[in-house]
Amino acid sequence: MSKIKNYIPKSCVLAGVDILTVITENKQNAGNLGKSSIANGVIQLQSLDYGIEISNTQMQNTYFHELVHQMLSSIGELELSENEKFVQNMRNMIFEFLRTADWIRLEEFKHNKFSDADSNAPFIKEGIAEIK
């Protein structure tokens, strides 16, 4: 399945709230590439930073950074949401996972299209991880 390269969600639902992604050109707020409001249901991304167009990767990074803020705020973790180091680390983990995940249709997986019988991959048996 395809990866998320050059994509961001135009909308989503988070904790029952519809979230819309919008692009702005706020030249007075240069250096701040995005902001979000769970109350308003918006993730706002800048198209320019000090007059220079934001790259696709920067825009994706900013989107997921703001999404982590919204996730934390929606579950009442306001202190963590204000911790930029924590937010950035969570963004790194989520974005890396989404960017590199190799997706398979669940029906293919269920029908043993990728069986562990042909590999040395770890598998789970009765709740205990075993390695062949």
Where are these regions (language model features)?
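Metalloprotease/metallohydrolase-associated module, dominated by Zn2+-dependent proteases
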Residues: 1-57, 74-132
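Active-site recognition of the HExxH zinc-binding catalytic motif
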Residues: 61-73
